[in-house]
């Protein structure tokens, strides 16, 4: 067969030449197809000029043109949408050979680099803000110690404790804890702290609120306590709101004043619970362990001299390194205490009614019957708690005549207390410029702040802050008498009663946290302006600032550090816990640890310390440069003096030479 016989005629289509593509499909991202050997060079040139990259999904779903169309219209094929479609590209990822599979690599194209560079540059421009307290995001749980913890699990074994631990109150609290923020605002009461000024004049504020809002404030050392009766009424004389009228008692005192007096006279016993608590620790079951140890000690008693150390098994139970616990009240003790408070209130009402004139005898008889009912039932409680003989235990004889009356009166007073928690709202005003609201709505809070801000009293607020500089701390709270342990979880405070002394203790820690937030916001712009200086010093070797400018910046940081550690009361324990209620200090510490005040202060001091050290280096370098400049000035002055001396000598020589020549 000759060579001419193998050549195709002009009208025939050229046959495809056999070709083996020895390429790596993983690295050929935009590999073009070559359906015909003779057309490969032209299509490659057109593809390089076009510079078009097609996606893999289009290649797998579209159908390519026929070979005849590709041959007759090569330009249309190179510039069309499906010019890069071939069987090789479609099946490039469906190969059994590992080397033929497409490798996924990170994009290194120039189009992706500017975006990454923009992200990095934007991150470098902004300094990392101060880390917020983790209890806002990590759902931190802190068990608040309280003396009203019912220890009804005390006679149960550990297994029974585990089975009976879930309760209705705790389940309700857990459901509230996991609600979103907008649901909490609608269903739960608010605790909000506002830092609106550098300080308050509490004496002037006492008079202002008493005259305009018709309330009876009380001053506790460095805090002003104000109780409002809900619903609030419109104010008079241009003021926005005022307190509602509280229920009057027979002695002329309001119900809220009696509740406040009762809370102040109540004994509070708290202890801080640290570390990981077991079920026994949570319920304070130390009497069982003590009784068991006493029984074992009675069985095997050995006398140890005083000068010898105690054996390991007979060491004293007191260990100062372990948390100490107060004995919790039993249900009967709680009931007795509440009844005693009711007795005192009823006695006070009876004395006031006897002293006042115009009261009917029917009211006196009713009050006396209530009082006798309370006293009779209280004697029954004492007799039931006192150890007695088996005969007396088997035949108890409660005062049946007064039992029903007492239950009715006691239930009425207890319901009134529970409803009174919802009918009252409270404000705690601290002398360092923080106001803490309890059980107010947001509109009511802003109305009270507006009345205080625009008051006509002089020096009521010391250096008030601008609206954009006001710091807030927001929590939610609820009252639940059935809860096992008062606690705070996910910024929700669960308490058993509306004792304002407990709320005052928690408000101290919340107010200090709000004041610390103000310091954190003050340091942010200072650090942003200072962060550029180390980079400039590393690039150019100079700061471009004078000594006075460096001293001003370092002075701002040092002033902030002094305000945090010395001037403010963030690190100090309030005087209230030293003079009024020392037993409330563990509760204050628990709330303070939840708000992470000590950790935040440490972070603030560390950041200030780093930049102050940098400023010290910069000031030393500037001082060294100034000393070098002064040294050069001295050298120039000495040179000038030498030149002047030489000039004087030369002039003298010339003058003397002229005189001698003449």
Swiss-Prot record:
Positions of transmembrane segments: 630-647
List where in the cell it is found: Membrane
Where is the sequence biased in composition, kind Polar residues? 286-304
Does this entry carry the keyword Ion transport?
Answer: no
Q: What InterPro entries does its record include?
A: DUF155, RMD1/Sad1-interacting
Compositional bias ranges of the Low complexity kind = 383-395
Q: Name the keywords, alphabetized.
A: Acetylation, Meiosis, Membrane, Sporulation, Transmembrane, Transmembrane helix
Please tell me whether the keyword Iron is annotated for this protein. no
Which residues does this entry mark as bearing N-acetylserine?
2
Q: Name one GO cellular component term.
A: mitochondrion
Main localization is membrane
Q: What does this protein do?
A: Required for sporulation.
Family membership, please give it.
Belongs to the RMD1/sif2 family.
Q: What is this protein called?
A: Sporulation protein RMD8
User: Coding gene?
Assistant: RMD8
């Amino acid at each position: 067969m000759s060579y001419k016989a193998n050549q195709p005629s002009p009208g025939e289509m050229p046959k495809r030449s056999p070709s083996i593509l020895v390429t790596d499909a993983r690295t050929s991202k935009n590999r073009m197809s070559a359906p015909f050997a003779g057309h490969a060079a032209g299509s490659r040139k057109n593809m390089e000029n076009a510079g078009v990259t097609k996606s893999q999904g289009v290649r797998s779903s579209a159908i390519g043109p026929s070979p005849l169309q590709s041959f007759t219209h090569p330009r249309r094929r190179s510039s069309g949408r499906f010019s890069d479609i071939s069987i090789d590209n479609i099946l490039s990822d469906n190969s059994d050979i590992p080397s033929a599979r497409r490798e996924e690599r990170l994009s290194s194209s120039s189009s992706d680099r500017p975006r990454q560079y923009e992200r990095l540059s934007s991150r470098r421009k902004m300094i990392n803000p101060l880390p917020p307290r983790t209890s806002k995001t990590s759902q931190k749980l802190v068990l608040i110690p309280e003396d009203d913890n019912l220890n009804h699990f005390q006679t149960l074994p550990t297994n029974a404790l585990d089975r009976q631990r879930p309760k209705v109150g705790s389940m309700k609290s857990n459901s509230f804890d996991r609600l979103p923020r907008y649901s909490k605002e609608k269903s739960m009461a608010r605790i909000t702290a506002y830092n609106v000024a550098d300080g308050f004049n509490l004496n002037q504020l006492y008079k202002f609120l008493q005259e305009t809002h018709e309330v009876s404030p009380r001053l506790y050392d460095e805090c002003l306590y104000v109780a409002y009766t809900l619903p609030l009424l419109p104010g008079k004389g241009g003021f926005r709101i005022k307190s509602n009228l509280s229920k009057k008692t027979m002695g002329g005192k309001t119900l809220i004043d009696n509740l406040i007096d009762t809370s102040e006279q109540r004994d509070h016993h708290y202890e801080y619970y640290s570390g990981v608590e077991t079920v026994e620790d949570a319920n304070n079951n130390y009497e069982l362990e003590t009784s068991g140890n006493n029984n074992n000690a009675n069985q095997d008693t050995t006398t140890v001299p005083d000068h010898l150390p105690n054996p390991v098994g007979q060491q004293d139970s007191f260990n100062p390194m372990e948390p100490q616990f107060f004995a919790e009240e039993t249900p009967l003790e709680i009931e007795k205490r509440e009844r005693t408070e009711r007795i005192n209130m009823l006695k006070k009402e009876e004395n006031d009614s006897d002293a006042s004139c115009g009261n009917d005898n029917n009211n006196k008889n009713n009050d006396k019957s209530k009082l006798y009912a309370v006293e009779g039932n209280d004697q029954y409680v004492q007799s039931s708690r006192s150890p007695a003989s088996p005969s007396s235990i088997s035949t108890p004889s409660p005062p049946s005549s007064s039992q029903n009356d007492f239950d009715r009166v006691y239930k009425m007073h207890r319901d009134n207390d529970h409803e009174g928690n919802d009918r009252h709202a409270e404000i705690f005003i601290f002398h360092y410029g923080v106001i803490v609201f309890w059980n107010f709505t947001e509109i009511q809070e802003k109305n009270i702040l507006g009345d205080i801000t625009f008051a006509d009293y002089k020096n009521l607020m010391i250096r008030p802050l601008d609206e954009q500089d006001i710091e807030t701390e927001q929590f939610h709270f609820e009252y639940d008498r059935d809860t096992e342990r008062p606690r705070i979880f996910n910024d929700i405070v669960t308490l058993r009663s509306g004792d304002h002394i407990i709320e005052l203790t928690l408000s101290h820690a919340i107010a200090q946290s709000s004041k610390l937030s103000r310091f954190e916001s003050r340091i942010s712009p200072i650090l942003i302006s200072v962060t550029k200086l180390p980079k400039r010093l590393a690039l150019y070797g100079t700061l471009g600032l004078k000594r006075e400018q460096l001293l001003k910046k370092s002075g701002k940081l040092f002033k902030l550090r002094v305000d945090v550690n010395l001037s403010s009361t963030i690190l100090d324990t309030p005087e209230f816990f030293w003079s009024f209620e020392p037993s409330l200090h563990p509760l204050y510490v628990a709330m303070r640890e939840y708000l992470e005040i000590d950790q935040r202060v440490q972070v603030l001091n560390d950041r200030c310390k780093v930049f102050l050290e940098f400023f010290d280096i910069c000031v030393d370098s500037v001082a060294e440069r100034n000393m070098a400049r002064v040294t050069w000035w001295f050298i120039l002055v000495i040179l000038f003096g030498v030149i002047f001396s030489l000039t004087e000598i030369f002039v003298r020589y010339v003058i003397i030479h002229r005189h001698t020549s003449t």
